Amino acid sequence: MKGIVLAGGAGTRLHPITRGVSKQLLPVYDKPMIYYPISVLMLAGIQDILIISTPEDLPSFKRLLGDGSQFGIRLQYAKQPSPDGLAQAFIIGEEFIAGERCALVLGDNIYFGQSFGKQLREVASRNDGATVFGYQVVDAERFGVIEFDENFNALSIEEKPQKPKSDWAVTGLYFYDKDVVEMAKEIKPSERGELEITTLNEMYLAKGKLRVELLGRGFAWLDTGTHDSLIDASLFIHTIEKRQGFKVACLEEIAYQNQWLSREKLNELAEALNKTYYGQYLLKLAKES
């Protein structure tokens, strides 16, 4: 299975901070924002990942992440010249996807919850159809909203409705089968001129091939698109890490646990960062394992 991180956009809600740097390169406590969505794909067992961003920002992502080998993954990069909709990611990434199943995660979404890795691996093992993730919110009119029947089977998906039919929002994480590229090509631009991910999900729903995984009580799904939400996310990660002593979205740790990195390689990476708490954490991890 392949994975895509969509890290484009102008980040206008975060101006003036994002006038000189991509939103997804901003820090969320002790890591660049893009570490968090990459960690989700890695937890799902995905090693081949495409980073899509603007032509202006791609060089910065390449400087930060390189070819991904230090995280036990294989990274490629592609340009999105203009933000023409989330579903455009599959058309841009057609050559990368190469007829395989593919997951898409938005570059400004953070997920944290117990047993999330197990849930992701189960979803990634499905060969047919699409899977989206639902999360209960108090302001559903801001999101794509899922309507369910009494057995929690999806009936409809509506983008930012004035009168939501439920309080379950579609989060920025999607898994699709090998048909996704051809289906994305069938989408016609919406009134705002974009290839909408909601339309793609509706197409799978019409075929009876859309599943919804619910992220329940106690799970955290954080958006980082505003100044306040960026601070809230940083404080959340800070609290978890300081209280429990482990790191959230530590890519080297996930790679090591997945046996994508050897202990020797982990030590080497840690030594390069030994003047930081992050590097000390990696050294401790290698010694204790």
UniProtKB/Swiss-Prot annotation:
EC number from the UniProt entry: 2.7.7.24
Pathway: Nucleotide-sugar biosynthesis; dTDP-6-deoxy-L-altrose biosynthesis; Bacterial outer membrane biogenesis; LPS O-antigen biosynthesis
The organism's place on the tree of life at top rank: Bacteria
Subunit structure: Homotetramer.
Keyword terms, alphabetized: Lipopolysaccharide biosynthesis, Magnesium, Metal-binding, Nucleotidyltransferase, Transferase
Record family assignment: Belongs to the glucose-1-phosphate thymidylyltransferase family.
Protein name: Glucose-1-phosphate thymidylyltransferase
UniProt feature coiled coil, ranges: none
One Gene Ontology biological process: O antigen biosynthetic process
Top-level enzyme category: transferase
Cofactor section: Mg(2+)
CDD domains for the chain: G1P_TT_short (cd02538)
Catalytic reaction annotation: dTTP + alpha-D-glucose 1-phosphate + H(+) = dTDP-alpha-D-glucose + diphosphate
Source species: Yersinia enterocolitica
Listed Gene3D superfamilies: Spore Coat Polysaccharide Biosynthesis Protein SpsA, Chain A
Cofactor note: Binds 1 Mg(2+) ion per subunit.
GO molecular function annotation: glucose-1-phosphate thymidylyltransferase activity; metal ion binding
The protein's role, per its UniProt record: Catalyzes the formation of dTDP-glucose, from dTTP and glucose 1-phosphate, as well as its pyrophosphorolysis.
Residues the record lists as binding Mg(2+): D108, D223
